[in-house]
């Protein structure tokens, strides 16, 4: 796997879960001898929703909700076979979305 790099993008609603998962990936990659660049925090996406709480009139009565999507980016440079095997066996938290690309 000389000259390749693995790019890992993580997404989660809870920043504690994403930071914990990122730390597990970094520790695993460093333990197997790969060089890690990151974690790079990407901009947080904020989605806001406004809901009328009155069943009939009173347009002034509203509730506002927000969902924040936290993102992190990791690059693993010059991964070894041991690195790939260790990352495949890694068990991350259920609330974290992981996208892996080879480049």
UniProtKB/Swiss-Prot annotation:
Gene name per UniProt: rpsJ
Membrane-spanning residues: none
GO cellular component: a single term: ribosome
Protein name (Swiss-Prot/TrEMBL): Small ribosomal subunit protein uS10
Protein task: Involved in the binding of tRNA to the ribosomes.
Keywords of the record: Ribonucleoprotein, Ribosomal protein
Domain of life: Bacteria
Subunit details: Part of the 30S ribosomal subunit.
Lineage: Bacteria, Pseudomonadati, Pseudomonadota, Gammaproteobacteria, Oceanospirillales
Native organism: Hahella chejuensis (strain KCTC 2396)
Family affiliation: Belongs to the universal ribosomal protein uS10 family.
């Amino acid at each position: 796997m000389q000259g390749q790099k693995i790019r890992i993008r993580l997404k989660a609603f809870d920043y504690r879960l994403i930071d914990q998962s990122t730390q597990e990936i970094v520790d695993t990659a460093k333990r197997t001898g790969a060089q890690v660049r990151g974690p790079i925090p990407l901009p947080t996406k904020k989605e806001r929703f406004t809901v009328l709480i009155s069943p009939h009139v009173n347009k002034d009565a509203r509730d506002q909700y927000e969902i924040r999507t936290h993102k992190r980016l990791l690059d693993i440079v010059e991964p070894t076979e041991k690195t790939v095997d260790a990352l495949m066996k890694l068990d991350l938290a259920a609330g974290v979305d992981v996208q892996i690309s080879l480049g």
